[in-house]
């Protein structure tokens, strides 16, 4: 018996969570990632590296959310960001245990070698983000650690071939 209709029905009932993710690149062409370590939520025991970013607020565009997240997570003010360079759609579990369909847009933002300013972090971010790190392209290409999105090197090669080469 084929139960594919059950999967389709379940996906049709799932909330779509729109979010903007930022590939933040410094003057040395390193990419900033945060390490998320979950201890007291539905993702307890999971640890991974991920980009700056987060969900859209009511009425926001992906671009507006990208600028807001850049300010909230790094203290960097931008009035706009360039067009997104990648789109991702996938199922994911949130720390609340809700399973959603994630609809992400990835943007590239260049900043000076500024330190991460955590003054605007939410309480949740303070709990789950254990550290930040600037990664070289080669480090990202060769790491065995869990990194989301897992295709950052390919996105960089496709978007900025004059800087990032395989």
Question: For each predicted feature, which ranges?
Answer:
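Charged phosphate-binding loop/patch that engages nucleotide di/tri-phosphates or the phosphate backbone
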Residues: 142-166
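N-terminal strand-loop-strand
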Residues: 2-50
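Generic "edge-of-domain/loop-turn" microfeature
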Residues: 29-30, 41, 114-116, 139-142, ...
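Short, flexible active-site-adjacent loop segments at beta-strand->alpha-helix junctions, enriched
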Residues: 28, 37, 87-89, 113
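Unchanged
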Residues: 56-80, 89-147
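A short acidic, glycine-rich active-site loop
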Residues: 53
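A generic membrane alpha-helix/interface feature
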Residues: 39, 91-95, 154-156
């Amino acid at each position: 018996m084929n139960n594919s209709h059950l999967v389709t029905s379940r996906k049709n009932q799932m909330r779509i969570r729109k979010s903007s993710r930022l590939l933040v690149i410094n003057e040395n062409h390193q990419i900033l990632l945060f390490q998320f370590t979950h201890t007291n939520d539905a993702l307890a025991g999971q640890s991974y590296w991920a980009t700056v970013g987060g969900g859209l607020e009511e009425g926001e565009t992906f671009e507006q959310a990208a600028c807001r997240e850049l300010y909230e997570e790094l203290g960097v003010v931008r009035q706009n960001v360039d067009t997104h360079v990648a789109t991702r759609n996938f199922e994911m579990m949130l720390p609340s245990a809700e399973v959603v369909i994630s609809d992400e847009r990835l943007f590239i933002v260049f900043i000076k070698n500024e330190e991460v300013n955590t003054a605007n972090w939410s309480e949740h971010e303070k709990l789950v983000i254990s550290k930040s790190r600037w990664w070289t392209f080669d480090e990202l290409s060769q790491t065995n650690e869990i990194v989301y999105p897992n295709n950052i090197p390919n996105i960089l090669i496709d978007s900025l071939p004059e800087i990032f080469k395989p």
